[in-house]
Amino acid sequence: MAESIARPSVLNATDDDIKNLLAADSHIGSKNLEVRMENYVWKRRSDGIHIINLGKTWEKLVLAARVIATIENPADVCVISSRPYGHRAVLKFAAHTGATAIAGRFTPGNFTNYITRTYREPRLIIVTDPRADAQAIKEASFVNIPVIALCDTDSILNHVDVAIPINNKGYKSIGLAWYLLAREVLRLRGNISRTTAWEVMPDLYFYRDPEEIEREEEQKAAAAAAAEEEAQLAAQTAAAEFEVTDSAAGTVDPTILDNATAGQVGQTTWEGDAEWNITGAAPSEWA
């Protein structure tokens, strides 16, 4: 077994970091074991699954972050993931650290054929899986580009300079690895403090199923439609309270008229008054 790497205590993993790694199944390897990954294995379970030593994982995460932080131009760091589980993670890593992301199929000749439109000359590349990203590692070896890789117990370490032992098959483990790597890089650069928590949550780096996203959008649309329907129903109910449904709309209520006339005293017309029927003689001369 290799001895632990000496490093300042400030770079040690916290209890929360180890708990997150355990919760994401970052320590679960595979049944196959590459001989050069044997130093990173803690034990082998009865079912044949190899358990990764998370202490070694954290050491290599810190080492990889220190290597990345030495690159003056962040855009010279190229992060690659051919596997769908790592697409979102590398894009978020690139957004937070300024690196260049290649999410999806790696076009052959990106690092070696300068005629192609996608030709790049990075100073460092980071891959999610040495098997899936073998073409990128092969081309990097041709032009002497250092390689950092997330390696499972069955990963081939040919042309890999820094291997981070971790479960690179689960989407939570992949997302958490990229999250911790980005956070450590930003801390080493001085962009964020070690004493305060980073406002970005780890699940932002996790892979999301497109069907799940569609279901969430449908649920939001249904909720918005239901809220709009309730608002329209409430408006119709409020308007119905002010509507006149009687056919005598606009006429005087007879009961109100009876009450008004019941209190009158005497004649209600002038024809019944004798004084109003006397015709006066017109004056014959003016004084």
From Swiss-Prot:
Locations listed in the record: Cytoplasm
GO cellular component: cytosol; cytosolic small ribosomal subunit
InterPro entries to which the protein is assigned, alphabetical: Ribosomal_uS2, Ribosomal_uS2_C, Ribosomal_uS2_CS, Ribosomal_uS2_euk, Ribosomal_uS2_euk/arc, Ribosomal_uS2_flav_dom_sf
Predominant localisation class: cytoplasm
Keyword list, A-Z: Cytoplasm, Phosphoprotein, Ribonucleoprotein, Ribosomal protein, Ribosome biogenesis, rRNA processing
PROSITE patterns: RIBOSOMAL_S2_2
Phenotype when the gene is knocked out: Deficiency of 40S ribosomal subunit formation, this is likely to be caused by insufficient 18S rRNA stability.
Subunit and interaction comment: Component of the small ribosomal subunit (SSU). Mature yeast ribosomes consist of a small (40S) and a large (60S) subunit. The 40S small subunit contains 1 molecule of ribosomal RNA (18S rRNA) and at least 33 different proteins. The large 60S subunit contains 3 rRNA molecules (25S, 5.8S and 5S rRNA) and at least 46 different proteins. Interacts with eS21.
Additional note from the record: There are 2 genes for uS2 in S.pombe.
Record's protein name: Small ribosomal subunit protein uS2B
GO BP annotations listed: cytoplasmic translation; ribosomal small subunit assembly; ribosomal small subunit biogenesis; rRNA processing
Family to which the UniProt record says this protein belongs: Belongs to the universal ribosomal protein uS2 family.
Domain of life: Eukaryota
Gene of this entry: rps002
Keyword Cytoplasm in record: yes
List of residues that carry Phosphoserine: 46
GO molecular function, one term: structural constituent of ribosome
A Pfam family recorded for this sequence: Ribosomal_S2
Function of the protein: Component of the ribosome, a large ribonucleoprotein complex responsible for the synthesis of proteins in the cell. The small ribosomal subunit (SSU) binds messenger RNAs (mRNAs) and translates the encoded message by selecting cognate aminoacyl-transfer RNA (tRNA) molecules. The large subunit (LSU) contains the ribosomal catalytic site termed the peptidyl transferase center (PTC), which catalyzes the formation of peptide bonds, thereby polymerizing the amino acids delivered by tRNAs into a polypeptide chain.
